[in-house]
């Protein structure tokens, strides 16, 4: 756990050839509220696009299923917004401070 997404998000954006301003929605996994706050502050994320339907504290984060669960949540929200939102990020905190991030493009 921890703030691994602080390193993972910029790396994923660079690999995708995108910038933070290109991202429309973010599903940020957190086991504790302080993790989300730290990642949002460190990266200067817009809180209005982070966990728009609630995060793992409210909805749960099943062990070993976080990435799949958050990805489906992101896809569903992108679909609901009828492609007004093109890019989304999913992050996963991993034990011992590791972090992972995936970037998705919504295509019609």
Which functions belong to the PLM regions below?
Residues 1-108:
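Claisen-condensing/thiolase-fold acyl-transfer catalytic domains that form or cleave C-C bonds
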